[in-house]
Regions:
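Transmembrane helix-bundle segments that form internal channels/tunnels in multi-pass membrane proteins
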Residues: 1-42
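Extracytosolic and intramembrane catalytic regions of membrane-associated proteins
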Residues: 40-164
């Protein structure tokens, strides 16, 4: 005998799908070694700022974003400009995001960018949201999300958790 209870599974599934779709996507991501970062551009897709060769992190970010591209896809560099001391790109709201490779890039990038990633120690007077050596060595990989007036961080190794 069929009862109205059979519809409860559909209700739960619909709720789970709605909850998953409502989960906000991060605006920027940085790998646990601080050498590879990604940002969400104007088209809503991830673009990659590469200093390192961490294709594993890129593959995982793309999979989590339901993006069929591979880490070697040329379109991951769309909107990214690089030189010898770093790379820059634009977030969806047109603010700059950068990854610093050479210390000489800090002065300009800290003054112009909203977010600066680096695997180096950064200067104390940087005006940007920084994810530098001190951050990723303490917390591992970092995701940043713009909440309207500031970035919120989600880290892989929060201090509130005792992990081996």
């Amino acid at each position: 005998m069929r009862t109205p209870l059979r519809w409860s599974g559909a209700f739960v599934a619909t709720g789970a799908i709605a909850w998953a779709l409502a989960t906000p996507q991060p605006d920027t991501l940085v790998a646990g070694d601080g050498q590879t970062a990604a940002f969400r551009g104007k088209d809503g897709r991830l673009a990659v700022l590469r200093a390192g060769r961490d294709t594993f992190a890129i593959k995982e970010w793309l999979a989590a974003d339901a993006d069929a591209r591979t880490p070697k896809d040329g379109s991951l560099g769309n909107g990214v400009t690089c030189d010898a001391v770093g790379c820059i790109g634009r977030l969806a709201d047109s603010r700059l995001v950068s990854i610093v490779v050479g210390i000489e890039a800090f002065a300009e990038d800290c003054a112009r960018a909203a977010v600066v990633f680096s695997d180096r120690e950064s200067p104390a007077d940087c005006n940007a949201m920084l994810v530098d050596r001190a951050i990723w060595q303490s917390y591992g990989a970092v995701a940043l999300q713009w909440t309207g007036d500031r970035f919120t961080q989600t880290v892989a190794l929060p201090r509130s958790q005792d992990r081996p």
